Amino acid sequence: MYKAIIMPVDVFEMELSDKAVRHAEFLAQDDGVIHLLHVLPGSASLSLHRFAADVRRFEEHLQHEAEERLQTMVSHFTIDPSRIKQHVRFGSVRDEVNELAEELGADVVVIGSRNPSISTHLLGSNASSVIRHANLPVLVVR
């Protein structure tokens, strides 16, 4: 089916990813690789240069925490763990999805989404932003 599948996840809101895991596995069934992507907010150190060292330590802590949670998430899959890669990046979800997709030559994005609320309709969501700006097919799982 698909060889490179990007699955953006929020490791601090795992329930959004549970259904998406099964769909990603289905799409990867013929030796595909699932690339879990967690995106942390872009660096605030540019505006807080007096506190740059503290901000950097905090970012390193967040990255380490995200990497640990991604590793835990791998256990939710039934496919061989060697076919699941983990990526933690800083920036906006939509930009990092497109950048990783280009780097990998990815085939599809699988993203979990919740039912829209009034705030989502007004402000948008990561899933809708990815859909609007993606350069490849996106499967949204609710």
Swiss-Prot record:
Coiled coil: none annotated. Gene3D superfamilies: HUPs. InterPro entries: Rossmann-like_a/b/a_fold, Universal_stress_UspA, UspA. Belongs to the universal stress protein A family. This is Universal stress protein G. It comes from Shigella flexneri. The lineage of its organism: Bacteria, Pseudomonadati, Pseudomonadota, Gammaproteobacteria, Enterobacterales.
